[in-house]
Amino acid sequence: MKEALEPAKKRTRGLGAVTKIDTSRSKGPLLSSLSQPQGPTAAQKGPKKTGPRGCTAVGSVLKNQKLAPTAPAQKPVRKRPGKRPDWDLKGQLCDLTEELKCYREKTQKLDQENQGLQEQLKEAQEQAAALGTERNTLEGELASVRTQAEQCQQKLEALCARVLELEEWLGTKENLIQELQKEQLELQEERKALATRLEEQERRLQASEAALLSNESEVVCLRQKTAAQVTLLAEQGDRLHGLEMERRRLHNQLQELKGNIRVFCRVRPVLAGEPTPSPGFLLFPHGPAGPSDPPTRLSLSRSDDRRSTLTRAPAPTTRHDFSFDRVFPPGSKQEEVFEEISMLVQSALDGYPVCIFAYGQTGSGKTFTMEGRPGGDPQLEGLIPRRMRHLFSVAQEMSGQGWTYSFVASYVEIYNETVRDLLATGTRKGQGECEIRRARPGSEELTVTNARYVPVSCEREVEALLHLAHQNRAVARTAQNERSSRSHSVFQLQISGEHAARGLQCVAPLNLVDLAGSERLDPGLTLGPGERDRLRETQSINSSLSTLGLVIMALSNKESHVPYRNSKLTYLLQNSLGGSAKMLMFVNISPLEENVSESLNSLRFASKVNQCVIGTAQANKK
């Protein structure tokens, strides 16, 4: 079989040069042929041989391409007129123009021929590359076949040897004594091998013991380094903790400089179908820094109808100016509003009670500000979902500093001075009256009996609670809104933080309150069956809002008695009001002129709150 394979090996010699094709030589003559219009072109002569065998393949490819011979370029034919006189410049110019045209046609024809030759050369090179690839493939297959043949030859030789061995074994069966002696020799050799192996194992054992001693000394060194690193880490932790405490102090100081009671005013945009306000009805004067300064003032005009009726003259306009911590015009987005209150999230995590109110008449956009609009549009999310997302994100970042936080949420409404659980589901609805009680005897912490307190750990769980509460909240049709909230909703999130390594704890409530619509009663209103319920609701709403104003004024005046118990709303929020809390009130007003009276009442109430100072907030730490 080896003799059969030898000719095949000889026949395949020299094939390795086929894949290497020198294409650089064909370009030179081709380009030179374009510059020499007379005589045969370089493409007609064919490529030169660059190898003994490999180049023949390229030559055959180029021959198969059947390159079209390029005809020698003809000189532009023109009639040579007689020499024109020197004064006939126009005629001379025509002759030169005609001659230039002929040369341009010749150049264009040569360019076309050059392009055709280049395309033919490219096709020839591609075919040569393909043939080289095919040759490499065939050589690989041939090598594989040779390897298989050699393996088969080896197996055949092994089988032949085995046959001879068996025949020899069968033929020497009578020489059993000699075979036993041979086996004895083999056993002796095996014993020697085992003894050698045992000595090797003993040497390896000694080497392992020496390595163990070396590793033990290295472990001692590493333990010393680890102890040094632990000490350094503890020092860095102490320094980081000191910086964190300083950050909290400066953050709280910054919030105190802004005011522990802050009032923002937001004007909702005009909705579709509503009349456009007259120019100058609502103005937003720029701050000291000009248009780049966020607005903090609002100017509202109002005509005195009574005076115009008496004088029979055009009603004069009275302008009312108000100043707040921040004013949001109708075009403000939810993201802009949230940016102004995002700093309070850190205050809640630091242990400061935080309370955010949304105040205003029915249809002024309070619920939209707090909860947003259902539908999943991120741009329309309210303060509650945005605040929860930011809260969980900051808590996750602070976990790297050793803080762990837990959150427990509740959502109740106060309807006609009755507390209702908005998170009640199924059979829990209506089971037992919800009352505000002390969590433990002697404790300042308040709790609502028969209300659900749900542990939450992510924003999706909070979104599910908001959706459930939105379905359970008391709404009714009013003159200003098709679905008006007729109750105060209070979303409470109890935040508990712990730093186990330092034994620090902080507990603080975060309250997001959507107050019911505030509007005055019309004394000339005819009461029907449904209007009596609306009247009772309005009286209860206005009474609780009035109590809220009295509580804030009492805290500002540092009175000895604060009337928390005059309303279920203030009684429930008493731990989030006062000197130990940070409060923010959103006053929402309508942009319509027909609601100017209610807008003025809301702005005046918010202006009184903005003038209150309740002292320095303190964190609830243990």
Curated annotation (Swiss-Prot):
Which residues fall in a compositionally biased region of kind Polar residues? 32-41
Query: What's this chain's function?
Result: Minus end-directed microtubule-dependent motor required for bipolar spindle formation. May contribute to movement of early endocytic vesicles. Regulates cilium formation and structure.
Q: Which GO terms describe its cellular component?
A: centrosome; early endosome; microtubule; midbody; nucleus; spindle
PROSITE patterns assigned to the protein according to its UniProt record, in alphabetical order: KINESIN_MOTOR_1 (PS00411), KINESIN_MOTOR_2 (PS50067)
Keywords (alphabetical) are: ATP-binding, Cell cycle, Cell division, Coiled coil, Cytoplasm, Cytoskeleton, Endosome, Microtubule, Mitosis, Motor protein, Nucleotide-binding, Nucleus, Phosphoprotein
| Sites bearing Phosphothreonine, chain numbering | 309
Residues that hold ATP according to the record: 360-367
Q: Where is this region: Disordered?
A: 1-88, 279-323
Coarse class of the protein's main subcellular location: nucleus
Q: Name one GO biological process term.
A: cell division
Oligomeric and partner information: Binds NUBP1 and NUBP2. Interacts with PPP1R42.
Provide the protein name.
Kinesin-like protein KIFC1
MF annotations from Gene Ontology: ATP binding; microtubule binding; microtubule motor activity
Q: Which organism is it from?
A: Cricetulus griseus
Protein family per UniProt? Belongs to the TRAFAC class myosin-kinesin ATPase superfamily. Kinesin family. NCD subfamily.
Coiled coil location:
95-264
